[in-house]
């Protein structure tokens, strides 16, 4: 019988039950009446309780001051109540207790309509915390931060009192490896600085619909191997000390809505600084607006050479294919290209709209490009045939060309410069 098992094993089993089922185990026996209170993991959702007082009462029992056992994981979801939501004392006491019980994984998500909770000061000096996820709360202006074991931080719609607060919070995590920032900010912030000697993965997702934010982001993380940016607010990005094997995923229009010559000219310094900071990336994913912006920039200034890049994933509008050779010219050692074209299936392009330039054959096509994967929604367009012909006729060592539809039987009649090339229909 399960009751004959030792308490630690029973607690482990109970930790996999939903909270509403967990509480009902109290009626099984006298021994089980308080056993659930000693679980090492708890997921507490205010929606499971009839009112605010019942929710707080339940949490207070679990975080009793006499508790001596450790708490490994605590997930807390707080949704708005009409009464009591503006009193954060219960949240402070729970997190204080969790810190004392050597919490390792903490996830707090608050959705009250009129109140933003501040995280208690005890959180900033938790010596055992390994994983932290915060959603719709405020980081306090803590003068002292010490999080020696924290490896993962996810921040969603988190507010901070000043721009130095988040910088200090991140830089005081000596073993931090992963940081995700989603819609965080401060209406008075100008520059967001992310400085870390241990950070390996960084994702920034900030859109105008989320909140007002800074105009500049500075990233200095010498061990960074993955950087994802989806930001249509910030006007300037400075990336320092990026690893030579880093992967980059960017959707970054530098705060521009239009890409006319005057608008792009106003961002030439910002684009130049950003491109110089990412020269060592080996794997780049670039999205529609960013590709268009960089190509518009190339008409004003020469693109730098991405000598370390071996893989490129580009999503672009078919109208922008004319810039592809220019962009590829800046990737002399490219081995793999994934090309995704988006647009209206009924679009027809004039001869001027798609120019691959018979005289321009990028260096990578002659010396390094081995794999091309074309994913395009258009059916039977002459322009698509031009695109495929361009790669088949000019890629000297191409090994495989992959297409996502089966209407290109004419491709077999196109002469190939590479004798090793395969044409694969998906």
From Swiss-Prot:
Residue ranges of every copy of the F-box domain listed in the record: 1-45
Protein name (database record): Putative FBD-associated F-box protein At5g53635
Species the sequence originates in: Arabidopsis thaliana (Mouse-ear cress)
Domain FBD: 353-405
Cited InterPro entries: F-box-like_dom_sf (IPR036047), F-box_AtFBL13-like (IPR053781), F-box_dom (IPR001810), FBD (IPR006566), FBL13/AtMIF1-like (IPR050232), LRR_dom_sf (IPR032675), LRR_FXL15/At3g58940/PEG3-like (IPR055411)
Pfam families, per the entry: F-box, FBD, LRR_At5g56370
PANTHER family the UniProt entry points to: F-BOX/RNI SUPERFAMILY PROTEIN-RELATED, FBD DOMAIN-CONTAINING PROTEIN
């Amino acid at each position: 019988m399960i009751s004959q098992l030792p308490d630690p094993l029973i607690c482990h089993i109970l930790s996999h039950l939903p909270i509403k089922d967990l509480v009902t185990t109290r009626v099984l026996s006298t021994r089980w009446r308080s056993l659930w209170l000693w679980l090492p993991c708890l997921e507490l959702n205010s929606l499971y309780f009839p009112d605010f007082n019942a929710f707080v009462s339940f949490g207070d029992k679990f975080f009793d001051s006499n508790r001596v056992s450790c708490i490994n994981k605590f997930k807390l979801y707080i949704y708005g109540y009409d009464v009591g939501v503006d009193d954060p004392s219960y949240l402070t006491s729970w997190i204080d207790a969790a810190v004392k019980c050597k919490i390792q994984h903490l996830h707090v998500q608050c959705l009250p309509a009129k109140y933003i909770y501040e995280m208690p000061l005890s959180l900033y000096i938790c010596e055992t915390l390994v994983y932290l996820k915060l959603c719709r709360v405020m980081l306090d202006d803590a003068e002292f931060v010490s999080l020696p074991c924290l490896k993962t931080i996810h921040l969603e719609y988190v507010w901070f009192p000043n721009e130095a607060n988040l910088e200090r919070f991140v830089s005081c995590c000596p073993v931090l490896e992963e940081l995700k920032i989603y819609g965080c900010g401060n209406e008075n912030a100008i520059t967001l600085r992310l400085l870390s000697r241990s950070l390996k993965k960084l994702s920034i997702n900030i859109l105008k619909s989320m909140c007002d934010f800074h105009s500049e982001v500075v990233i200095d993380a010498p061990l960074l191997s993955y950087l994802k940016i989806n930001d249509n607010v910030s006007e300037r990005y400075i990336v320092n000390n990026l690893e030579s094997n880093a992967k980059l995923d960017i959707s970054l229009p530098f705060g521009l809505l239009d890409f006319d010559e005057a608008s792009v000219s106003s961002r030439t310094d910002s684009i130049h600084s950003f491109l110089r900071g990412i020269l060592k990336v080996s794997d780049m994913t670039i999205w529609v607006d960013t590709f268009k912006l960089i190509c518009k920039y190339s008409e004003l200034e020469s693109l730098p050479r991405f000598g370390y890049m071996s893989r490129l994933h580009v999503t672009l509008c078919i109208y922008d294919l004319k810039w592809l050779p220019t962009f590829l010219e800046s990737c002399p050692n490219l081995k793999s290209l994934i090309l995704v074209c988006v647009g209206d299936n009924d679009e027809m392009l004039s001869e001027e709209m798609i120019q691959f330039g018979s005289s321009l054959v990028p260096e990578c096509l002659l010396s390094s490009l081995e794999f091309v994967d074309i994913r395009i929604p258009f059916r039977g367009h002459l322009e698509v045939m031009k695109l495929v012909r361009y790669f088949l006729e000019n890629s000297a060592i191409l090994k495989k060309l992959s297409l996502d539809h089966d209407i290109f039987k004419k491709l077999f009649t196109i002469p190939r410069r590479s004798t090793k090339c395969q044409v694969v229909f998906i």
